[in-house]
Amino acid sequence: MGAHVVPYINGRLWDPLSEAFRTYHGDRALCVKRDGSYYEEVYRSQVPHNVSCPSSEIWQRVQGDVIDSISKRLSTAGVYIDQVACAAPDLCYNPDHNHSLGGGNWWAKGYRDMYQTARARSINDGQILATEECAECYIDLFDLMLIVNTDRRGDNRPIPLFPIVYSDRALYTGYCYIASPINNGSFKFITAKSLLWGSQLGWIQPGRIVAADAQREALFLKRMQQFRAKVRSILVGGQLLGEWSPGEVPLMDVPGHGQHPAVLGAKWRSAEGKPYLLLVNWDDQSHKLTLPTGKRITLAPLSAWVDEVPCQEK
């Protein structure tokens, strides 16, 4: 089917009731609070997990062995390592760990040592390492970063700060969690934003996008994927300069995201230094607008457009 399988593991949490925890003496790898207790987190599975210390030799060995097994024994396209570039460092007062007590740069260094070693040991040129979110200190460690925790409150207006700074040296996918239902305009808006900010598209459960009531969304996603392939040379290695709005198209209500123009735009500069304007009409209606050059164009419903257009940087 042409699908690339990248299994999930967690780079930070460990189930204390798991067999591996007992086998590897996982308690020795955990972050220890000042009072001697462990950090505990509970997610959707409702199973308590403890936070592992990235400087622990035990945790580094466990992560390395799991990545090696997945990448070689299963021959997958890579490994997705959750939470590493997402969660903030925890203080650790375990005197047996190879770091100063409390906080410090040892946290990031532990992860860097861990995954640099794992890559050299287990990941070939046709495989990737991916993680959640986009902490700066890990950009060079991962081939793909999943952007997923963007605030969805309607009174907020997220800005593409990370892509503006790092779009020419990082690859990322996603925009935010995709709420239900997806056929109320929110998925098309998220897809448009993702494309314009440089994200790889398609981060959604397959069952939701192939559902009978999501045919327009599936069509839009397919068109945007085809368009992204067309402008890949701009987005990969290029630099996002900022967003652009025509200012003459109607605003649309997006559940969970507030009001936004029916046509969204972004200014990019390719690796060759050429300026481009990308536009996406995520509405079911066509819209006329004026380009920065003064030229008038009409964008068809659920379509995208690109051209070499001088755009003043702001």
Give residue ranges: language-model regions.
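Short, well-ordered coil/turn segments that N-cap beta-strands
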Residues: 1-3, 75-77, 123-127
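Active-site-proximal loop/turn and secondary-structure-junction residues that shape catalytic pockets
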Residues: 9-15, 85, 133-137
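Active-site-proximal substrate-binding groove within the catalytic cores of carbohydrate-active enzymes
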Residues: 60, 64, 107-306
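Aromatic-lined substrate-binding rim segments of carbohydrate-active enzymes
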Residues: 1-6, 98-103
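Active-site groove signature of glycoside hydrolases
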Residues: 62-95
